[in-house]
Structure formats: C-alpha cells, structure tokens
Amino acid sequence: MYSDKYSLCFQPDATLIEQVKVMKLQLGEVIGWYNSKNSLAHLTIAEFQASEKDIERMHQQIQRCCSGFIPVETHLSSFGTYPNGTFFLEVDSIAKSQLKAYAQKLFQTLQLKNAYKCTDPHLSIGRKLDETKMQQAYALFEQPNLSFCCDLIVLRRLNMERRQFDIISHYPFLSQPIEEETQLRLF
C-alpha cells in the first residue's frame, strides 16, 4: 500500500512565523545554507508514514482531540541545543507541560506505529549544525522574548519536489468539553 510521510505540528501564529523566518534568514547570512532554513516555524508533535485511508481515519480523531484542547499562551525566551546539532527556541515550562499533555493525548488516540514522536516541545531554528555553526548561532542572537497563543495543530505532507512539508489540514483548539467514549453493558 502506498504511503506518504506526514508531520503533525503545533502551529504558531503568522506574526511568530514571520519573526522566526527573519531569524532563519539572518542565521543563513552568517553560516550559509543549513537544515530547516526554509521550513515554516512549527513545533513537531510526530512524523510518520501513512496511507490516504489512514489519514482519513486520523482526520476525525485529531479533530476530536483538538476540539477539547484549550489555547496555550506560549513563551519562547531562551535558546537550546540538542546533541544532534539542533538549535532551537525553548518553550517555557508552563506551556511545555500543557503541550506535552496534548501530544500524549494525540499519541494515545492515533496509535501511530513506527513514528518519530517529539517528547520535548521546541521550535527549531536549525538542524544538523556542527559546533562552530552552533556557536555562531548563539553569538548572532540576543536572548529571545517571543510569544504566541498556541491554538492550532496542522497536519503536513512531505512534498518530495520541494523537500518541504505542505500544510494539508488545520485543527483549531475549540475549548469544548470532551465526552469520553463509554461502553454500555447489558446485565
């Protein structure tokens, strides 16, 4: 069965997307091309392979989860790195714990097999940077003071021609109470 690569992400607002785009362009002027330079700002929840049939099933599940999610005021006030060369904007601890809970709910609901699951919400500026480029990134930027209201998850499909993900669905947080499915029994 044919499958595509998909990415489920928390999507910042247009203002933050533009601010991060400017940061990525500034970094590119200093270090040249790098992984994630052209990607739209996002916080990855999971990446996975799926068929169109799988996506149709997941669409309703994601929608149902997001209808119960409450928007989260998210602050990005420091940079961080991972050993794999990722340079990122760190999510504040209060928002991070809420976004982790939302991601866990999605993992439990979707039951994604063989998926990359992000367990530490962050907003990547660059990936696969060597130590020198990492130091240049730290030197370039002052301490960030960015924020956005996280109120949307997007589903993205990898566009093989552009080698970038394209957004194919939006799932707004609706702050509605969720009725858990209950099983009725006859005695």
PLM regions with names:
Residues T86-V91:
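Charge-rich, low-complexity N-terminal segments
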Residues S77-N84, P121, V154-Q164:
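Short proline/glycine- and acidic-rich turn/helix-capping motifs at secondary-structure junctions
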Residues M1-P71, S93-C149, F165-F187:
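Basic, often amphipathic N-terminal segments
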